[in-house]
Amino acid sequence: RAAQVIAARLKSTDATVTRRGRSLGFSGGVTRHEKDLLGERQIPDAALYGVQTLRALENFPITGVSLRDFPELIIALAQVKEAAALSNTQLGLLDQKLGDVIVRACHEIEAGRHHEHFLVDMVQGGAGTSSNMNANEVIANRALELLGEPRGTYAVVSPNDHVNQSQSTND
C-alpha cells in the first residue's frame, strides 16, 4: 500500500510549480542560469537555493513535507556551517572575508530568516545530501548578496568549496 501511495505522489507531483499548495517560486519571472555536472538550469532569481536543490525537488518529491517545516533542523544545519566556517577561518583554510560573510549568513538563518528557501523533501535519497546542499546553496547565495554579488556567482562563494569546506557532502 505504501508503495502505491508513493508511486501516485511521484506521478502527480510537479515539483516545479507547487507542493501542498505552496509555491516553490517557479511561477515565472526573472531567472538566473546555474550549471552543474548534469548541465545548465534556470533558477528563479529571487531564490537563495541553487541547481542542486532544484534537482532534489525534481528527483525526490516524495512526501510533500519540506525542510522548511522543521525550523529547528534548519537552525542546526546553519550552526554546523557556522562552526565549520569559523574553524576553517581560524586554521587559515578559508579567507577571513569569506568566513565572516558565511558566518553572517548563518546568523541570519539561525535568527529565523530565509527558511522559506529550504525546500527539499524530508524523505530523499542520498543520506541527507540534498538537505546539506540546500543549506550550502542558501548560505552561499546569501553570503554573495551580503558581498554585493549576484546569486549564483559561485566562483566568489561556493556552496561546495567554501560553505561545505572540511565536511563531507552529507554531513
Which sequence ranges carry the predicted segments?
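Conserved, well-structured ligand/cofactor-binding cores
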Residues: 24-170
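Cyclic-nucleotide recognition modules
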Residues: 1-10
